[in-house]
Amino acid sequence: MSIEIANIKKSFGRTQVLNDISLDIPSGQMVALLGPSGSGKTTLLRIIAGLEHQTSGHIRFHGTDVSRLHARDRKVGFVFQHYALFRHMTVFDNIAFGLTVLPRRERPNAAAIKAKVTKLLEMVQLAHLADRYPAQLSGGQKQRVALARALAVEPQILLLDEPFGALDAQVRKELRRWLRQLHEELKFTSVFVTHDQEEATEVADRVVVMSQGNIEQADAPDQVWREPATRFVLEFMGEVNRLQGTIRGGQFHVGAHRWPLGYTPAYQGPVDLFLRPWEVDISRRTSLDSPLPVQVLEASPKGHYTQLVVQPLGWYNEPLTVVMHGDDAPQRGERLFVGLQHARLYNGDERIEPRDEELALAQSA
C-alpha cells in the first residue's frame, strides 16, 4: 500500500508546525521520520493515521484520498511508545482485541481468531507468555505484544511512534533487528518516528530528516550520511567538526594559516568548515596530505580503530575529533599531523560549492 503525502500544512493556532510537506512512500517500504523535538515528525505520523487532521493538503493511500477519512476506516496499525496495552487482559486477549471488535460482517469466528493470535504469538516469540498480564512482562515483551496487536487486523500500513524509546539500549537493538526481519517477511508499508539516528539508519529503507516543519532530506540511509543535502542534516547526523575561518580571494584562512581553494568563490568573508571525524587525514609524520600539528588529548580504542580528541597546535583554538585506524593506538600527549580532507564550506545555511565535489585542504599556502 503506497502513501502519497501532498502539500500537507498543519497549524495549531498561530503556530505552523508543518510547512507544505510532500512525500511519496512506495508500497512495502519502511521509512523513518527522523528529527529533533519540535520538527513535526510525530504530527505528520498522526496525520497519516487520521489521529490529526491537516490544515490543508492531501493524504492518499494507493491513489485513494483518505484525507477526511476517520482513523478507524483507514486500516492503519498504530504502535505507541508506551505500548497502550490493556492491563486487565492477558497477552492473548490484548492481541485478539482488534479482531473481536470488528464489525460483525468482518469479524472472524472464535476458531479463526485463536488461530491467528497463536500464529502472531509464535511470530513475536511470545507463545509461552500467552496467559500472562502486561504487568508481568518486560518492556521489550510489551512492545512485541503491541506490535502483534497492531498486525492482527492485517493493516495496510503500520505506523510506529518512537516504538523503542522507552526501552534500554540492548533491548532496543534486539527489537530493531527483529522489526526489520518482520518487515522483510511480511512486506508491509511502514512509517516510524524516531530521534535516534542509529535506529533510523539501521532499520529504515529511507530516512526522512525533518526540522522545524520541513523535510531537509529524504534518501537512503547511506546517502544521508555521505551526502547531506543541507547544513542541518550535516550537523544533525552524527559527529562533525566545525572550524570557523574566512575566505579571502582564493584562500581559506583559519588562525595564522591559509590554504588554497583552487578557485576563487564569489562569496568572500566568514565561513564555517565542516568535516566528519573519519574524513580527517591523520598521520604520525608530516606530509602534504597531513601538514598540521596536533596533540592527542583523549584516545578511545574502538576495536579496529581509535577515536581521538586532538588539540591543534598553533593553528586553531578548539579541539577536533578524529579517527585513526590500525592497532597501534596513539597515547595521550603524542604529537600527530592532520589534513582537512573532504571539507565542506558554508556561509550560514548556503554551501559554498567548489569546482569539484569537495574541498581537500591540506598544505598551507
From Swiss-Prot:
Subcellular location field: Cell inner membrane
Entry EC no(s): 7.3.2.3
Keywords: ATP-binding, Cell inner membrane, Cell membrane, Membrane, Nucleotide-binding, Sulfate transport, Translocase, Transport
An example molecular function term from Gene Ontology annotations: ABC-type sulfate transporter activity
GO-annotated cellular components: ATP-binding cassette (ABC) transporter complex
Membrane topology per record: Peripheral membrane protein
Keyword Coiled coil attached: no
Recorded catalytic activity of this chain's protein: sulfate(out) + ATP + H2O = sulfate(in) + ADP + phosphate + H(+); thiosulfate(out) + ATP + H2O = thiosulfate(in) + ADP + phosphate + H(+)
Keyword Translocase part of the UniProt annotation: yes
Boundaries of every ABC transporter domain copy: 3-237
Binding-site positions, ATP: G35, P36, S37, G38, S39, G40, K41, T42
Top class in the EC scheme: translocase
Coiled-coil zones: none
Record's subunit section: The complex is composed of two ATP-binding proteins (CysA), two transmembrane proteins (CysT and CysW) and a solute-binding protein (CysP).
Similarity annotation: Belongs to the ABC transporter superfamily. Sulfate/tungstate importer (TC 3.A.1.6) family.
NCBIfam families: 3a0106s01 (TIGR00968), PRK10851.1 (NF008105)
Function field: Part of the ABC transporter complex CysAWTP involved in sulfate/thiosulfate import. Responsible for energy coupling to the transport system.
Protein name as annotated: Sulfate/thiosulfate import ATP-binding protein CysA
Organism: Escherichia coli O157:H7
Gene for this chain: cysA
